[in-house]
From Swiss-Prot:
Binding sites annotated in the UniProt record for sn-glycerol 3-phosphate: K110, G139, T141, K195, D248, S258, R259, N260
Lineage summary: Bacteria, Pseudomonadati, Pseudomonadota, Gammaproteobacteria, Enterobacterales
InterPro entries: 6-PGluconate_DH-like_C_sf, 6PGD_dom2, G3P_DH_NAD-dep, G3P_DH_NAD-dep_C, G3P_DH_NAD-dep_N, NAD(P)-bd_dom_sf
Main function: Catalyzes the reduction of the glycolytic intermediate dihydroxyacetone phosphate (DHAP) to sn-glycerol 3-phosphate (G3P), the key precursor for phospholipid synthesis.
PROSITE patterns in alphabetical order: NAD_G3PDH
Residues of the active site: K195 (proton acceptor)
Organism (species): Escherichia fergusonii (strain ATCC 35469 / DSM 13698 / CCUG 18766 / IAM 14443 / JCM 21226 / LMG 7866 / NBRC 102419 / NCTC 12128 / CDC 0568-73)
Lipid metabolism among keywords: yes
Top-level taxon in the UniProt lineage: Bacteria
Protein name as catalogued: Glycerol-3-phosphate dehydrogenase [NAD(P)+]
Reactions that this protein is recorded to catalyse: sn-glycerol 3-phosphate + NAD(+) = dihydroxyacetone phosphate + NADH + H(+); sn-glycerol 3-phosphate + NADP(+) = dihydroxyacetone phosphate + NADPH + H(+)
Length: 339
């Protein structure tokens, strides 16, 4: 591979970053995958697979591993960031001085900035300036299924139409990976944060033993909360009926591959927050997202009762069953009301 001729550099060698890198490479593109741990990258190079997360999926020949950040960023103008939301800004500040002058940045990170609750587009603009084209991909994607080449569909939004077109062409694979473009940059970002919160609630409901009726009601009312918050932020309500909204919400709330759902189930079964996090063993994005989404809702005056009760369980010690009873005991309302 020419040192400056890769189609994409992927920043983040966890399960999802690796799965996206495999997907791009399987499409015939030269891809560089960078990880912050040199020992981990050396292991990936040796094994030609990510044995920790995706042990049954060998790397295509066009997937190249790199532990030197400068070398990785020099390899391509297209940078795909796949890191947890709480380190997103830190990673962007780290890569900024090493990026090529023609660089374009897309992220698959789902969530909001830790502590501030800002959209990641605002974090990116602050870290990188106003000139660089930005994009986000989001949707119902479990890493194992994506890496295995099973049919998957996502949404893509960008500040730059040329970048959006290029990304759609790079990522789209007629056999397994369908990429829908969407001009709603805010909505595509927001859906991925709120669904993490609702998935914890769905897990709690199932952990308590409430059944399919309750789970479905929670998903539906969770979608209403997502849509209300999105409208307050200027998103297009139609976005939340697409891949980055309803699609991701249903997937994360109903399948046990979801860490957020499993975390919620443990809480519903009576486990404490810290023990549940330790048992999951990986980042549970919804834990931080709950606090951030709640703060964002308060800032914009949006009522989100499900989010509020999940916050009470995670941060105030409320019992999951008590939280559920609080929701069930709310005053009667018109289903179409804004609260």
């Amino acid at each position: 591979m020419n040192q400056r001729n890769a189609s994409m550099t992927v920043i983040g060698a966890g399960s999802y970053g690796t799965a996206l890198a495999i997907t791009l490479a399987r499409n015939g593109h030269e891809v560089v995958l960078w990880g912050h741990d040199p020992e981990h990258i050396a292991t990936l190079k040796r094994d030609r697979c990510n044995a920790a997360f995706l042990p049954d999926v060998p790397f295509p020949d066009t997937l190249h591993l790199e532990s030197d950040l400068a070398t990785a960023l020099a390899a391509s103008r297209n940078i795909l960031v796949v890191v947890p939301s709480h380190v997103f800004g830190e990673v962007l500040r780290q890569i900024k001085p090493l990026m090529r002058p023609d660089a374009r940045l897309v992220w698959a990170t789902k969530g909001l900035e830790a502590e501030t609750g800002r959209l990641l587009q605002d974090v990116a603009r602050e870290a990188l300036g106003d000139q660089i084209p930005l994009a986000v991909i989001s949707g119902p994607t479990f890493a194992k299924e994506l890496a295995a080449g099973l049919p998957t569909a996502i949404s893509l939004a960008s500040t730059d139409q040329t970048f959006a077109d290029d990304l759609q062409q790079l990522l789209h694979c007629g056999k397994s990976f369908r990429v829908y473009s969407n001009p709603d940059f805010i909505g595509v970002q927001l859906g991925g944060a709120v669904k993490n919160v609702i998935a914890i609630g769905a897990g709690m409901s199932d952990g308590i033993g409430f059944g399919a009726n309750a789970r479905t009601a929670l998903i539906t009312r969770g979608l209403a909360e997502m849509s209300r918050l999105g409208a307050a932020l200027g998103a297009d309500p139609a976005t939340f009926m697409g891949m980055a909204g309803l699609g991701d919400l249903v997937l994360t709330c109903t399948d046990n591959q979801s860490r957020n759902r499993r975390f919620g189930m443990m809480l519903g079964q009576g486990m404490d927050v810290q023990s549940a996090q330790e048992k999951i063993g990986q980042v549970v994005e919804g834990y931080r997202n709950t606090k951030e989404v709640r703060e964002l809702a308060h800032r914009f005056g949006v009522e989100m009762p499900i989010t509020e009760e999940i916050y009470q369980v995670l941060y105030c010690g409320k019992n999951a069953r008590e939280a559920a009873l609080t929701l069930l005991g709310r005053a009667r309302k018109d289903e179409r009301s804004s609260h």
